[in-house]
Amino acid sequence: MARTGIRIKGPRAASEELHEAIIVGGSYAGLSAGLQLARARRRILIVDAGLRRNRFVSQAHGFLAQDGRSPDEILHDARKQLLEYGTVTFLRATATEAAGSMNDFRITTDRGDSHRGMRLLLATGLKDELPAIPGLDERWGTTVFQCPYCHGYELNRGRIAVIATGASAYHHAAMVADWGEVALFTNGAVDLDDEQERHLKDRGVVIERERVLRVSGATTIELRDGRSEPFAGIFTAARTSLASDLASLVGCELEDGHFGQHIKADRFGQTSVSGVFACGDGTGMAGSIAVAVSSGATAAVGLHRSLVFA
């Protein structure tokens, strides 16, 4: 197959080409969806801003045959393979506007380009919003994490801190206890009942109610009473928000999840708007590459069927 490469358009260019699908978001879910649609010989445009959610992470884990690889390398290889299909165009840009209806959607980018598509697939992801504790942001993805399946094993059963952000901290701490010796810092964010406390203690979790002042060094937690506690790693459940407002712009219904709003979609990615599909973290899926890839592939099947049976 002839490789298409990355299409470069001049400023304020407008394309009247009608793509069969426009995918907004070229990370794991978006590229996975693109691959399925390319293999169905559909003409697709992928628009990606290059701000994947796990861009702070140096190694990816839990993804079959890719365990321990750099997320950048995984994406590079995926994009290279996808662009071997002659019906695929990739555009490095941020989609800023979206409008339209079934068979005639239009997106506009920050470059001034506009593009038309019969279907729209949103793989725009989420933004993480960490607790306002000094030292957390700059360590996010290196020594501060959310997913123990992605990062717990490498802590070698060392001491692990879980900083509460809400009621989910009980479940978070109980789960993380399989990866090391856990201290749960309630930080005024969660009230544990007697049964929860008993369960956590049975799991070997130490409950610490003193407020967290800051994180220093690699993974040292400094408390308001002056104590400092070193850890192998820190877990916390970030609040999330949609990384793009395109879903709202085209009228998609949103719903509340455990950590923030996400796009409401059925198991094949169909949103509340006919012809608009969604996949990946932005639909409330667990934040892992493996789950994102699965979500993208499944949404692509739903989108493809809608083209066939419209």
Task: Annotate the PLM regions.
Residues 1-19, 76, 85:
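Extreme N-terminal leader/targeting segments of oxidoreductases
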Residues 4-8, 129-167, 171-174:
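Glycine-rich dinucleotide-binding loop and its adjacent helix/turn
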Residues 19-73, 158-159, 164-190:
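Beta1-alpha1 glycine-rich phosphate/pyrophosphate-binding loop at the start
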Residues 34-35, 170-172, 279-310:
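A conserved FAD-binding loop/helix module that cradles the flavin
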Residues 42-43, 49-51, 58-85, 146-147, ...:
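N-terminal glycine-rich dinucleotide-binding loop that anchors FAD/FMN and/or NAD(P) in oxidoreductases
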Residues 76, 82-109, 114-117, 180-261, ...:
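A Rossmann-like FAD-binding core segment of flavoenzymes
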Residues 132, 138-154, 240-290, 298:
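FAD-site-proximal beta/loop scaffold in flavoenzymes
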